[in-house]
């Protein structure tokens, strides 16, 4: 039996890539799409909804969300309230929101996934960085994205820093008496690590984790050149959350 999928934010680039992935997978069935700014009532013979409230009681299994940070939390909670297992690629959630959604998913007996990055290579980068941080506590992150991305730093960079902080010796990176001649020149501070965000046209999603030690350096890098790189992870997420009973944060928990 096919997994019935709703895609919120289907008009965006990630939403369009997700729609094409679902439409070409015989195990998935795209039953509805959501976008508040769409003027048509159908898209490729699929019903279009402008208001998520109209989807209450709709028959579907999974809610895929590629919207905006401003509405992602409300959308995810709405999905859980209505029996849809959420697969969320929108970033910008606070740790408190994630904890609340995890608890609510358990109460609803529904699986779910919030993933800062759906590219398998990016997930591996985070795992490699976590291993390296045990031995190289001096580390900085540079994340680079297209200039339409609304949040900084990226969810992937934050997740990478969180994972490294769990195993890394907590030290302040840089000189103890350093001075920023221009505010923000050293980037954002996360547990003593620095995170730098680059936003330029022509980029998609890229991240470097740079480690330094006496006389040596180690650089880990992942590049997504096309949004199709995320679709393997989205497909995996859709097929896994219907088997689960709790929302997880990070694709690595489903691998």
From Swiss-Prot:
PROSITE patterns: DAPB. GO terms for cellular component: cytosol. Pathway: Amino-acid biosynthesis; L-lysine biosynthesis via DAP pathway; (S)-tetrahydrodipicolinate from L-aspartate: step 4/4. One of its GO terms (molecular function) is NADP binding. Its EC number is 1.17.1.8. NAD(+) binds at residues 9-14, 35, 89-91, 115-118. The active site is at residues 145, 149. Keywords: Amino-acid biosynthesis, Cytoplasm, Diaminopimelate biosynthesis, Lysine biosynthesis, NAD, NADP, Oxidoreductase. GO terms for biological process: diaminopimelate biosynthetic process; lysine biosynthetic process via diaminopimelate. (S)-2,3,4,5-tetrahydrodipicolinate binds at residues 146, 155-156. It is found in: Cytoplasm. It catalyses: (S)-2,3,4,5-tetrahydrodipicolinate + NAD(+) + H2O = (2S,4S)-4-hydroxy-2,3,4,5-tetrahydrodipicolinate + NADH + H(+); (S)-2,3,4,5-tetrahydrodipicolinate + NADP(+) + H2O = (2S,4S)-4-hydroxy-2,3,4,5-tetrahydrodipicolinate + NADPH + H(+). Coiled coil: none annotated. The keyword Endoplasmic reticulum does not apply. It comes from the Bacteria. Its main location: cytoplasm. InterPro entries: DapB_C, DapB_N, DapB_N_CS, DHDPR_bac, NAD(P)-bd_dom_sf. Belongs to the DapB family. Catalyzes the conversion of 4-hydroxy-tetrahydrodipicolinate (HTPA) to tetrahydrodipicolinate. NCBIfam families: dapB (TIGR00036). This is 4-hydroxy-tetrahydrodipicolinate reductase. It comes from Streptococcus pneumoniae serotype 19F (strain G54).
């Amino acid at each position: 039996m096919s997994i019935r999928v709703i895609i919120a934010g289907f008009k965006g680039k990630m939403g369009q890539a997700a729609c094409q992935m679902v439409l070409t997978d015989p195990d998935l069935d795209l039953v509805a799409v959501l976008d508040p700014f769409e003027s048509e009532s159908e898209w490729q013979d699929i019903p279009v909804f402008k208001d998520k409230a109209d989807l209450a009681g709709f028959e579907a299994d999974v809610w895929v969300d590629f919207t905006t940070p401003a509405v992602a939390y409300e959308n995810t909670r709405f999905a859980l309230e209505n029996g849809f297992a959420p697969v969320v690629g929108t970033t910008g959630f606070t740790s408190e929101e994630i904890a609340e959604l995890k608890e609510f998913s358990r109460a609803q007996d529904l699986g779910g996934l919030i993933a800062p990055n759906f590219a398998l290579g990016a997930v591996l980068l985070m795992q490699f960085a976590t291993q390296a941080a045990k031995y190289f506590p001096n580390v900085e992150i540079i994340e680079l994205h297209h200039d339409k991305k609304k949040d900084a730093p990226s969810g992937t960079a934050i997740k990478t820093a969180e994972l490294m902080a769990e195993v890394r010796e907590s030290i302040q990176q840089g000189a103890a008496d350093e001075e920023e001649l221009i505010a923000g020149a050293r980037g954002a501070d996360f547990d003593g690590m620095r995170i730098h965000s680059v936003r330029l046209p022509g980029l998609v999603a890229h991240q470097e984790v740079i480690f330094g030690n006496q006389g040596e350096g180690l650089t880990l890098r992942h590049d997504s050149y096309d949004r199709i790189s995320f679709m393997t992870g989205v497909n995996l997420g859709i097929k896994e959350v219907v088997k689960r009973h709790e929302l997880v944060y990070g694709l690595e928990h489903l691998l």
